[in-house]
Amino acid sequence: MSNQACFSNPGPELWNALGWHPSSEQLEQMIALQALLRQWNARVNLTRLVEGGDYWILQVFDSLWPLQSELQNAQQPRRCIDIGSGGGFPGLVLAIALPGASITLVDSVGRKTAALKAMAAKLGLTSRVTVRSERAELTGQDHCCRGLFDLAMARAVSTAPVVAEYLVPLLKPSGEALLFRGHWSPNDAKDLAKALRFLQADLIKMERRELPDNRGVRHQLRLRATLPCPATFPRPIGVPAKNPLGS
């Protein structure tokens, strides 16, 4: 069997590469999520990556590889939030893989959040998954969310300075922000460092990973607040993207 065939299905090769193995129930939920995405894509443009390695590598594996420490303590209670959830990655996959966690999914597109709610219900995750249909700038200023999360994350949302402005205000004092990135350069690092000075946060980890089956290179960035985030951040809707911090 070729490597491509191995990684097109949720077999042992995939989980060995990840260094974590789901329970039979978790695997069934991930397969069910794939089927739900196929159904919902007929009505809502959630994601085109729903078949074979596109799903298992570019969605599931890519959502989980930065979370090795969390996966080793999967039953630990933790509050997580996924900004720009789209089709449910990484948020729904994390809800499956981390049974001790409560997950808040945020997306500004109402049709997508309706799909997320329905999929979470079908997967039996309603008790641990909350869905908010709003812009990230509003989430970060809402007292129900600001400063309350152990882990705030975003995948394929915007540039690192913009994403940092969305995530850092959501962190509790011991919390971490996780930025999923593809390409990462010294210039990207400089831009992020400038933004973090405004947000009173530091970069505490940067890790590079090659995806299986030559599916590309990914980076994870971990941020931690050094002081309470200034109340002015995140700025009003649209401002972070139009005028990134430090630009």
From Swiss-Prot:
It comes from the Bacteria. The keyword rRNA processing applies. Signal peptide: none annotated. SUPFAM superfamilies: S-adenosyl-L-methionine-dependent methyltransferases (SSF53335). Keywords: Cytoplasm, Methyltransferase, rRNA processing, S-adenosyl-L-methionine, Transferase. One of its GO terms (molecular function) is rRNA (guanine-N7-)-methyltransferase activity. Its EC number is 2.1.1.-. One of its GO terms (cellular component) is cytosol. It is found in: Cytoplasm. Belongs to the methyltransferase superfamily. RNA methyltransferase RsmG family. Specifically methylates the N7 position of a guanine in 16S rRNA. This is Ribosomal RNA small subunit methyltransferase G.
